[in-house]
């Protein structure tokens, strides 16, 4: 249930930028850079524009797509294209840390949460809140959610039944 989390050490030009934007999470080295540079050669990066406008604020996506300029990893993180930026030697360890953090959570909640996030994204506000309420109600019936509430009340760490 862990989302695909790519890592990027170097340059992500249109195709790689497209692939990174499609992922729900990403980790990059401080040396990484991103561009949709097709416009520099007379070709608007139409395909990369689809995930970019779904993952970046429209103004940042528009600037990347219309200028073809590179952005560095820190800018990509500030704009929401990557989650974390670390020095290249720490890239694998940081990715492992992120994956481990997700795997240590109750996997039923992770699966339900991911499914709800994907579905609600294309819904109107009211429908999204309805789905969120339904998901929360179903999630609260799960033994791990009940264990989490009990652990919170007892001021202890939860003992998940289904850790990865």
Kindly give the residue locations of the regions a language model identified.
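Short C-terminal tail/terminal secondary-structure segment
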Residues: 157-164
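Short beta-strand->loop
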Residues: 124-129
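Crotonase-fold acyl-CoA enzyme core
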Residues: 1-110, 142, 146-150, 156
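Short, glycine/charged-rich beta-strand-loop motifs at protein surfaces that mediate ligand recognition
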Residues: 99-100, 121-123, 137
